[in-house]
A protein has these predicted regions:
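Substrate-binding surface in catalytic domains of secreted glycosidases
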Residues: 81-144, 173
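Active-site cleft segment of glycoside hydrolase catalytic domains centered on the general acid/base Glu
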Residues: 1-82, 90-102, 106
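Substrate-binding cleft of secreted/luminal carbohydrate-active enzymes
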Residues: 118-124, 129-204
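Short, flexible coil/linker elements and helix-boundary hinge sites characteristic
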Residues: 45-46, 108, 140, 161
Length: 204
């Protein structure tokens, strides 16, 4: 079992829109206090979950963030914290490794890494209203159906117990030039390279 303290605190703790300026010292103190109290409660109640800090997002894109080093400091120095959680919503496939590399190499994190969110949402969002086009007519849909309409439809089918095939789903996205090829394979290799302990992802 895992408990993560925080959810993309670069956003929660930001003092302005650049996501860099924040009360890092106050947040560091909060996380340390939270981790220590959680540990006391664990011992009192016989709980066995592991405590992680995080979940850091866009680490490689926010080199001046005051929140990132605060969180990393807690991970590196508080013995009650097992590791760090990363959320990796990369825009381009070559960004898949960036956050992991910086956390390990620049910040010297040697404890466990987990990734409780990774997705291609930032690559997909600009295209959700794109039409299915020729692919749609070939697969029993209309050419004018939008990607978001297709996704809603197949979600309904899946909930009804009649999901579309993996081959169909994959072929749609491979028909678009913007789709980052080998997206999940690339992430899988990155997770292995950086010895990621636990991973959960989503499509968007």
């Amino acid at each position: 079992e895992i408990l993560v303290m925080g959810n993309e605190p670069e956003w929660e703790n930001a003092l302005d829109t650049d996501l860099c300026h924040a009360d890092g010292e106050d947040y560091r103190a909060f996380l340390n206090e939270f981790a220590n109290r959680l540990t006391t409660w664990k011992q009192a109640n016989g709980w066995t979950f592991d405590i992680y800090a995080g979940a850091l997002n866009r680490v490689s894109e926010l080199p001046k963030s005051e929140t990132v080093p605060a969180v990393v400091s807690v991970v590196n120095n508080n013995p009650n914290v097992v590791g760090l959680d990363l959320h990796v919503h990369a825009l381009k496939i070559n960004q898949a490794e960036d956050d992991f590399r910086i956390i390990r190499d620049k910040y010297g994190v040697t404890k466990k890494l987990i990734c409780t969110e990774f997705s291609m949402v930032r690559a997909l969002n600009p295209h959700v209203a794109d039409a299915l086009g020729e692919w749609g007519t070939k697969h029993g849909y209309t050419a004018g159906m939008k990607i978001y309409e297709y996704l809603n439809l197949i979600a309904e089918k899946a909930n009804a117990g009649t999901p579309v095939s993996a081959t169909e789903f994959k072929s749609l996205f491979e028909s678009y030039s913007w789709y980052p090829k080998n997206w999940y394979k690339t992430f899988y290799e990155v997770f292995k390279k950086y010895d990621t302990y636990a991973i959960t992802g989503r499509f968007s």
